[in-house]
Amino acid sequence: MEPVRPVPPPGRPDPPRAGSQAAVKLARLLREAGYESLRIQERLATGEELLARSPELPSYLRRLGDADELAVLLRLLLLGVPVTRARVEEHVGDALREHLGNAGLLVPDGDAVHGAARLVPHDELLIASDHAGAAETHADHVPGVHRPSVALAHLTVRRSGERALDLCTGNGIQAILLAAHAEHVVATDVNGRALAYATFNAALNGADNIETRAGSFFEPVMGEQFDLVVANPPYVVSPESAYLFRDGGMRGDAVSELVVRGTPPSLAPGAFACVLIAWSLDPGDPAARPRRWLEGSGCDAFLLHTSTDDPIETATVWNRDLVDRPEAYADALDRWLAYYRELGIERLGYACLVLRKRADGRDGWVEALQLPRSALRPAGRHVERLFETRGRLARMAAGRALLGRRPRVVDDAVVSQDTRFSGGRWHAQALSLRLESGLPFSAELDPPTARLLRELDGSQTLEEALAAAVDDDHARDEGLALARRMLEIGFLELDDEAEGDR
């Protein structure tokens, strides 16, 4: 009978390990066996990202069977289900089986074999972590890639630089991504098991410029500066101290405050940081607490606000592993809700805070942007462009100096219009504008705005475009303000920088 949940191996295996050459060979053998995202999605008949959980385990097992190499590998390394030793020897090639064994990824158990770790493809990467579900008894559990870590990767500004820092590296995926455009990456974590996974994953993906350091938050890099910092800390506002990856052991949102206040001193002038945070949100001023944490930081910042949850939503999300144990699940929800009542928390905000260290050291601006709940996509260049445009607008001598520039609609903007059938006829709906890449912003367009956008192709000044699109001075003033706002969020871009902008 097929299992209904992952079956942990006997004992607790150490994280896998391999030298750089052996790890690269292992990755090559896995890919040759079809252990890649698209092939796996085809076999499992899913378009879902292969993240840290496999809720459809019974369905997946029945689709796979166990009579070919990829099926056996997926059972062992993705789904966490043992396979008979005979099946492993019959279907997994000798070289691959040897490399998996040498890396500690196969655990014999009588006539069965277990996968010692979960191995998941993400785009071109392979990322190992502890199997999902193993967190129930181990504080140092190392999870796989979750949606927040995907969001952080998508929102990170990726510029070439000498030194980068991955704070609270976990399984190391952010450090590996940084290694592609930084000469040297430092990855820190208080969890030694996480550092072991990060080391293995770096080798598996051919990233030989990553240095791991053990320690809490900024302690391992005190006094150092970096060209880029990313951080996925244990930001969850939690009454627990059970899991290092989730619970920071501090009261309320103190972990997020510590990381936000500690990041600017670690940034070189002009450097960027991308940090995931959570905070007790004031509905009257949602960005109040993060803005206060940034006072005196010498940074400009965009607070990319991804979601707002009530206490029950938060408690449910972070305790869903207990759903098969109803009494423990109910107790955890009650404990978390009591904690939020004690702290007076009615709403919790979640965001990626993107910082840029000012060269002049002065206090900068902080702007909150609400991101749609739709799936994020790679947007680092869009985020960087927002900083560049904001700086150029600030350098213009006067507000109306923008009238002499030649803004244009960005290449990935799309205008569309729906029609609705009602009362025996078709009715045109409002025009809408959206971006097909970068941050998933969209907006409805009224007719004057649509006319203005048609004029903004970069061939004429904004003043000329406004004169062609609207009829009176009041409408032109409104159009100027609207064009400025559309520049600030990336629907428009400016022409090449002129002398007056500097």
What are these regions (language model features)?
Residues 4-72, 111, 134, 360-454, ...:
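Acidic, low-complexity/disordered tracts enriched in E/D and polar residues
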Residues 69-116, 154, 165, 184, ...:
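Long, charge-rich, low-complexity alpha-helical segments
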Residues 108-159:
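Class I SAM-dependent transferase core
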Residues 146-231, 237, 280:
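Conserved SAM/SAH cofactor-binding pocket of Class I
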Residues 191, 252-305:
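Conserved Class I SAM-dependent methyltransferase catalytic core
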Residues 192-193, 233-258:
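Mobile active-site "lid"/loop adjacent to the S-adenosyl-L-methionine
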Residues 311-388:
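Flexible, glycine-/basic-rich loop-and-beta segments that form/coincide
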